[in-house]
């Protein structure tokens, strides 16, 4: 857990432009791993914040016409500052409006990581793809989708699902940790985007090991939380997840991590 240990020591400032539903949970989750979250949204202060920040999360869960230009502006400011961006195109396939905005953002700014479920990532590379809400289609070939998205956007791809797929540096890994309860908590996936951002440390071309550790730390914490005798369901799972992120140690991490490199 080299990266998590570094986070706990250095408390990296992680800027989150995220959706209204998940701000509190995202901030608390970042605090739990040792990062320092800032939910700054004003383009007017972005230049100053981005001089000292370590990464920026952009999550479009509550995209509106009123915040479109702000998102484009902060993404471009992040590029100018050399700040890596984690982009979470929430429900991009659910509407033409979302898909058009995501395409515009990805043309207007360079992101370091695109994170979403298989349906969301597919929607970014296939104009005919649609989706229902934020649910991933379990029948999709996530590895193939991730590889195509990586080739299209020349950026790291993280696809979440029952198994997670990471493609970066022309390498692909499948990770098999996690808990079904993550799908029963609003904002769990959005928090993962923030966690990934917390692991970047101003690396606009992130090391695949950082991405693997970020996703594995989050999902192993979810496993441990779900197995806790006090976990009775989604309501108790959420605070237990935060507690487990806070307490997660190297021994538990190494004992539980399940990862396979794939062609």
Swiss-Prot record:
HAMAP family: Thz_kinase. Catalyzes the phosphorylation of the hydroxyl group of 4-methyl-5-beta-hydroxyethylthiazole (THZ). This is Hydroxyethylthiazole kinase. It comes from Staphylococcus aureus (strain NCTC 8325 / PS 47). The keyword Nucleotide-binding applies. Its EC number is 2.7.1.50. Belongs to the Thz kinase family. Its cofactor is Mg(2+). Gene3D superfamilies: 3.40.1190.20. It is an enzyme of class 2 (transferase). ATP binds at residues 115, 160. It comes from the Bacteria. It catalyses: 5-(2-hydroxyethyl)-4-methylthiazole + ATP = 4-methyl-5-(2-phosphooxyethyl)-thiazole + ADP + H(+). Keywords: ATP-binding, Kinase, Magnesium, Metal-binding, Nucleotide-binding, Thiamine biosynthesis, Transferase. GO terms for biological process: thiamine biosynthetic process; thiamine diphosphate biosynthetic process. Substrate binds at residues 39, 187. Pathway: Cofactor biosynthesis; thiamine diphosphate biosynthesis; 4-methyl-5-(2-phosphoethyl)-thiazole from 5-(2-hydroxyethyl)-4-methylthiazole: step 1/1. GO terms for molecular function: ATP binding; hydroxyethylthiazole kinase activity; magnesium ion binding. The gene is thiM.
